[in-house]
């Protein structure tokens, strides 16, 4: 039915409208494309395997060594913080005028501690003058 309508109105169509859009298939070009596709797939697989090996043999040991180093550094920090807990206020350096200025109390807690106050690290030092 379509062909009948197309032939009837063929005079109003452009001259190439009823011809096939593509010529006959090129078997050699198709084979080259298939080989290129297979080579790309093999390259992708090899590259993926290479990055897996790099991740396992380079990245994981580097992370492990960094973790060991971090453990010892943080262990020293913990010992230092434990020591600072027992230091009396009189041995701490004096606060400067610009430190711990409160123009009005904070609306949380006791009004004197900042939002990110950490009682292990932060402390108010009271000196007798």
From Swiss-Prot:
Pfam families named in the record? COX6A
* Gene Ontology cellular-component annotations: mitochondrial inner membrane; mitochondrion; respiratory chain complex IV
User: Mainly localized where?
Assistant: mitochondrion
Pathway connected to this protein: Energy metabolism; oxidative phosphorylation
Record's keyword terms, sorted: Membrane, Mitochondrion, Mitochondrion inner membrane, Oxidoreductase, Transit peptide, Transmembrane, Transmembrane helix
Which GO biological process entries does UniProt record here?
aerobic respiration; mitochondrial electron transport, cytochrome c to oxygen; mitochondrial respirasome assembly; proton transmembrane transport
Q: What range does the transit peptide cover?
A: 1-9
Q: Where found in the cell?
A: Mitochondrion inner membrane
Q: Name one GO molecular function term.
A: oxidoreductase activity
S-S pairs? none
Q: Where are the transmembrane segments?
A: 44-71
Q: Which domain of life is it from?
A: Eukaryota
What ranges does the Mitochondrial matrix topological domain annotation cover? 10-43
Which regions face the Mitochondrial intermembrane side of the membrane?
Answer: 72-129
Query: Membrane topology for this entry?
Result: Single-pass membrane protein
Q: Which Gene3D superfamilies match?
A: Cytochrome c oxidase, subunit VIa
Family from the record = Belongs to the cytochrome c oxidase subunit 6A family.
As for what it does, the entry says: Component of the cytochrome c oxidase, the last enzyme in the mitochondrial electron transport chain which drives oxidative phosphorylation. The respiratory chain contains 3 multisubunit complexes succinate dehydrogenase (complex II, CII), ubiquinol-cytochrome c oxidoreductase (cytochrome b-c1 complex, complex III, CIII) and cytochrome c oxidase (complex IV, CIV), that cooperate to transfer electrons derived from NADH and succinate to molecular oxygen, creating an electrochemical gradient over the inner membrane that drives transmembrane transport and the ATP synthase.
Assembly, in brief, is: Component of the cytochrome c oxidase (complex IV, CIV), a multisubunit enzyme composed of 12 subunits. The complex is composed of a catalytic core of 3 subunits COX1, COX2 and COX3, encoded in the mitochondrial DNA, and 9 supernumerary subunits COX4, COX5A (or COX5B), COX6, COX7, COX8, COX9, COX12, COX13 and COX26, which are encoded in the nuclear genome.
Write the protein's name: Cytochrome c oxidase subunit 13, mitochondrial
């Amino acid at each position: 039915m379509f062909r009948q309508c197309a032939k009837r109105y063929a005079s109003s169509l452009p001259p190439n409208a009823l011809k096939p859009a593509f010529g006959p298939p090129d078997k050699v070009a198709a084979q080259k494309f298939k080989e290129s596709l297979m080579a790309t797939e093999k390259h992708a697989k090899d590259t993926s395997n290479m990055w897996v090996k790099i991740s396992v043999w380079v990245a994981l040991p580097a992370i492990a060594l960094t973790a060991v180093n971090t453990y010892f550094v943080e262990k020293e920090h913990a010992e230092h913080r434990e020591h600072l807990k027992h230091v009396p206020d009189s041995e701490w350096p004096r606060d400067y005028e610009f430190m711990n200025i409160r123009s009005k109390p904070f609306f949380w807690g006791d009004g004197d501690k900042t939002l990110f106050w950490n009682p292990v690290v932060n402390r108010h030092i009271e000196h007798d003058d």
